[in-house]
Design a protein with these regions (language model features):
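Coiled-coil phosphoacceptor/dimerization helix of two-component systems
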Residues: 44-55, 75
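Short helix-loop "hinge" at the ATP-lid/N-box region of the Bergerat-fold HATPase_c
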Residues: 122-123
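Conserved catalytic submotifs in the C-terminal HATPase_c
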Residues: 66-71, 77, 88, 93-102
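Short alpha-helical segment of the dimerization/phosphotransfer core of two-component systems
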Residues: 37-45
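Short conserved segment of the HATPase_c
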Residues: 154-168
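Helix-loop junction within the histidine kinase core
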Residues: 56-67
Length: 218
């Protein structure tokens, strides 16, 4: 996975640049759609490799938590900006509702990994022309970050299996996007390692909301 990550990162960067610099009016709608599909596939593979590497390191105790005090809202905004392009392929709007500044005590990279996975999943299971709302609010001595979609949702049986290492699974997204099911387990692991937790609410056919909490700056 480590040997594949660098070349995949280069391919991902080139495809992103092409999509940004070559609008449909210049290369035609069909070619633009093919380019968008290639970009999405590359994003999925890169995310899988990244999750696999981090999960492996975490399980063998080689991934240390580096605590810092930082504004998690800036962290959230940077991830949303990255995913605007991916969401745009399905004409999905990403919106943030919350305070402009919430200082937390956590590992910056791990928080970004959680946000990337939750947003990626929300886009994957959302329908075209919909909206995903990201929120952040202070609850007691923690911040609770939420990612809400109005997509496929989950059955009660799937909800019971989702965050269990023995029964976790993966399903196709609304545009037949693939996944490994590993991302949410990594999110759960990182949330707990930072003194927080991860949970969700879902209703089949109506969508899901995923939450994670981390301690506020003291």
């Amino acid at each position: 996975a480590h040997d594949l990550r660098s070349p995949m990162g280069s391919i991902k960067m080139v495809l992103n640049m092409l999509i940004l610099s070559l609008p449909p009016s210049q290369i035609g709608e069909e070619m633009y759609q093919m380019l968008s599909m290639a970009n999405q596939s590359t994003e999925d593979v890169f995310a899988l490799l990244d999750n696999l590497l981090k999960w492996t390191k975490s399980q063998i105790g080689k991934l240390n938590v580096v605590y810092q005090d930082f504004n998690i809202v800036e962290n959230i905004a940077s991830v949303i900006e990255i995913f605007n392009l991916v969401a745009g392929i399905k004409n999905i709007k990403l919106r943030y509702l919350g305070d402009d500044k919430i200082e937390v005590h956590a590992d910056i990279d791990m928080m970004k990994t959680i946000m990337r996975n939750l947003l990626s999943n929300a886009i994957k299971f959302s329908y075209n022309d919909s909206e995903i709302v990201v929120g952040a609010r202070i609850v007691d001595d923690s911040v609770v970050v939420s990612v809400r979609d109005s997509g496929k949702g989950m059955s009660e049986e799937d909800q019971r299996k989702l965050l269990n290492t023995e029964t976790h699974f993966s399903k196709y997204g609304t545009n037949n996007e693939e996944g490994s099911g590993l991302g949410l387990l990594l999110c759960l692991d990182f949330a707990v390692k930072n003194g927080g937790r991860l949970w969700f609410e879902s209703e089949e056919g109506k969508g899901s909301t995923f939450y994670f909490s981390v301690p506020l700056k003291e």
